[in-house]
Amino acid sequence: MKVTTRNPWLWIPTLYFAEGIPYFIVNNISVLMLAKMGVPNGMMGLFTSLLYLPWMIKPFWSPFVDIIRTKRWWIIAMQLLMSLAFIMLTLCMPHPSVAEIASRNTPIGIFDVTLILFAITAFASATHDIAADGFYMLALSTKNQAAFVGIRSTFYRLSSIFGQGVLVYIAGYTETHGLGFLGIEAGDIPASWQLTLGVTALIFSLVTLYHTFIVPRPATDHPRLDTNHRKAGAGAIFHEFANSFATFFTK
């Protein structure tokens, strides 16, 4: 692996901005979108609450992120997976009828693919959180870790403003006024959310492309299994997993 270093200002702001976007898409935008599409609260409540589960249970698989591959690999791989999920969410957006939306009785079954893609995004995002936070500790000196803690927090909050403010505004404006140059008429709720997810997919894909080249490759970023252990196969992996799991719960 070629070791590279980068000015932290080049990648920390965008890394933590990217960390927040999928979290707010899955836990906030999904609920608002389904409600606007006319899905009854009782039907969507269970499914959308389950989408938060990956962040609750991520300690159970975080040891695998330490054991297998580098933190950088996990960051880029999960961002690529989430970019693909956002693209698929845009392309597979269901379009319930105006009557279904108005009746507030849109069947949640037509959103099966959408919910699966949100679930994939949730697991990828939780895994990305593990890798990004670990990478932050590896790639920066103790001094820089302290210096940039406010920066990472600020850009995570900016992603909240983007996810819960800018994207919601785009959907609301498009629904109210339409966008004639895109063929979206006023009142077309499904198209307004399709556009919103399309904007998300575009921005997140560009950030992912940027990170592919800019995120550094520090010498300290390596799997816990060295080459000899990796040749030992699954036994060594699960041995390391057990050690990591035990360490986590004894802290």
Regions found by a protein language model. Give the residues of each.
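Intracellular juxtamembrane helix-capping segments at the cytosolic ends
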Residues: 30, 123-141
